[in-house]
Amino acid sequence: MENNKKKLILLDLDNTLICAEDLDTVKDKKRLSQAQKQFRTVRMEDYYDIFERPHLQEFLDYLFKNFKVGVWTASSKDYAIFVIKNFITAPQNKVKPDRKIEIFLCSHHCNVSKKYFKGISKDLKLVTDQWKIIDLSQVKLVDDLEKLANHQPENVIHVKPFFYDEPNSKNDTELLKVQKTLETFK
């Protein structure tokens, strides 16, 4: 499939692809230590431990093969770049796979969206109507915020939020479900 004909998938980061634990507020250090053994974890300086959602790399391989991929997160720019570099474009310090982020939107862009679109932090009309980057029928947002899915039901794929410390989180298959859903969008 030619890259210029591929549709666009925008990915949220926190609780969609990864889960971050603020190291200053950890209450159960034993549980954190156990989770570090169960999940691929990357420490961002002494601020956060960031946990990879199960099946993330398989999911990303599928996305980059079949779609243009972008990120739209409510997180700060620096934090988002750290997550992208460590989990999306160069995972596990391996040779960088052929993964290029087509569009990168962060907290600033969420604020712009709220300004233009009645308080909705990730209204896709910002990229389709306001900036005219892509047609609305050619884009999907994968996000854990149900509010976004309710606002844009045709364009948002809602995922169950990922928390590393929830029971059975190691067996999470949410990204595989999204992959199956996207088969009909290609």
Curated annotation (Swiss-Prot):
It holds the Pfam family NIF. Keywords: Hydrolase, Protein phosphatase. Residues 2-182 form the FCP1 homology domain. Its EC number is 3.1.3.-. GO terms for molecular function: phosphoprotein phosphatase activity. The keyword Lipid biosynthesis does not apply. The keyword Chloroplast does not apply. May function as a phosphatase. PANTHER family: DULLARD PROTEIN PHOSPHATASE. Belongs to the IIV-6 355R family. This is Putative CTD phosphatase-like protein 355R. It comes from Invertebrate iridescent virus 3 (IIV-3). The lineage of its organism: Viruses, Varidnaviria, Bamfordvirae, Nucleocytoviricota, Megaviricetes.
